[in-house]
Amino acid sequence: MEKTLKGIVLNSFDFQDYDKIITIYSNLYGKISLVCLGVNKIKSKNKYGINYLSYSNFEIFKSKNKFNLSKLKRSELINSFNHISTDFNLYLYANIITSLVLSLDEQIKNYNLYKTLKLSISIINNKSDFGLKVCVLFMFYFLKIIGNQIDLSKCGFCNSKINPIIAISFTNYCSSCKFCYFDDCILIDNQLSNFINSIFKNDFITNLSQEISTNNLNILTRFILNYYQDIVGTYTTSMYLLSTLIRFN
């Protein structure tokens, strides 16, 4: 059956001489893979809308069997987000986000994730200064999607929400109040404490407007990268490369 949908290309690879298989995250079906016949031919009109990170309209022949690939009929490029490809750091941020979404099961719709993904890639492309912040917030947001959410807004040792948070532990992956502070915890200032509280109380868009210094953002970046590696069990090449760029006092 024919369907029309919008989506962002998460992955694309050659299949046979003139064909590709792409995976997109769509408004109608969530993650879905498509076989794109003939798109590697010079005269193909579909080749522009199926590149990595392309946001496009797709007309597809939807497979009735979930074990068979759906087929692309036509693609129409809406936005290539091409500025991302010109900057190594921006590419890392976008690739971390898309690799997380790519890890999800096929055809489980989550429209809020679709909107957040599209917004995140758009901001990274158009407002490069927000790129790392968007990436980190998305990584925290994605923990909710996979059911692995942590709560740093309370002390992870005594569970108090009354005592102010003064540090975060990279060993126990939790926050610490002044009564539970250990030497292996990293002391944080009020700005980072407030930003962390905002992550767990407010939505993605609200958190984008919260102030955070470069050093504090780097602390949070290192924390969430380590959490994905040690607790979630996900650590992509882009995550590793980003970790090599992060420094904090």
Swiss-Prot record:
Assigned keywords, A-Z: DNA damage, DNA recombination, DNA repair
One of the record's GO cellular component terms: bacterial nucleoid
Entry's Gene Ontology BP terms: DNA recombination; double-strand break repair
UniProt KW DNA repair keyword: yes
Database matches in InterPro entries: ARFGAP/RecO, DNA_rep/recomb_RecO_N, NA-bd_OB-fold, RecO
Family annotation (PANTHER family): DNA REPAIR PROTEIN RECO
Record function comment: Involved in DNA repair and RecF pathway recombination.
Protein family: Belongs to the RecO family.
Protein name: DNA repair protein RecO
